[in-house]
């Protein structure tokens, strides 16, 4: 019987896979978005920057920055949920990442955003919820909040084309 790996080793491996997935998308770095992993849940953080303000008179976050946060969160959340399942089943080896074999991310088919209120000039958080994930197609819902998770300032729903496993 094989002994289970130490928890710290498993955490480091999962973090390495997540970092490789995120680093594979230049827009994430450009926007300054980072991801916090707690078990299988991911929370995106977009730190406040002055250049993210769209309306300086309110001031309010630019709608494009909000949309970018939500779409990136949905894509990374969907890719991570699939990678998580594969890692748990043992069908994905983190050594692939070390060898430079990065996972392909889903492609956006459509993405609809509901702006519920103005985003304030402060850090924004987002989380994605996969509502359906098949071999070819997936649906994801995402929401963004700032001070109180129960009061999102924007939410989105998107459909994605899943990468083929060639």
Please provide the spans of the model-predicted regions.
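Hot-dog-fold acyl-thioester-processing enzymes
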Residues: 50-94
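A generic structural micro-feature
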Residues: 25, 59-62, 103-105, 120, ...
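Hydrophobic beta-strand-centered segment that forms part of the acyl-chain substrate-binding groove
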Residues: 75-125, 130
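Non-catalytic linker/capping segments at the edges of enzyme domains
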Residues: 1-53
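HotDog/MaoC-like acyl-thioester-processing domains
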Residues: 2-12, 76-79, 115-166
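A generic structural signal for short beta-strands and their flanking turns/coil linkers
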Residues: 31, 40-42, 107-111, 122, ...
């Amino acid at each position: 019987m094989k002994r289970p790996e130490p928890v710290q080793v498993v955490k480091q491996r999962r973090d390495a896979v997540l970092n490789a997935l995120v680093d594979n998308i230049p827009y994430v770095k450009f926007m300054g978005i980072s991801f916090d992993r707690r078990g299988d849940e991911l929370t995106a953080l977009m730190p406040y920057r002055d250049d993210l303000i769209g309306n300086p008179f309110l001031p309010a976050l630019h709608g494009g920055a909000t949309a970018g946060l939500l779409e990136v969160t949905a894509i990374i959340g969907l890719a991570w949920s699939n990678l998580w399942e594969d890692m748990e089943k043992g069908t994905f080896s983190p050594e692939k990442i070390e060898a430079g074999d990065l996972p392909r991310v889903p492609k956006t088919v459509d993405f609809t955003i509901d702006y519920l209120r103005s985003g304030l000039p402060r850090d924004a958080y987002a989380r994605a919820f996969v509502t359906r994930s098949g071999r070819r197609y997936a649906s994801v819902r995402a929401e963004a909040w700032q001070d109180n998770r129960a009061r999102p300032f924007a939410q989105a729903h998107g459909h994605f084309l899943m990468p083929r496993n060639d």
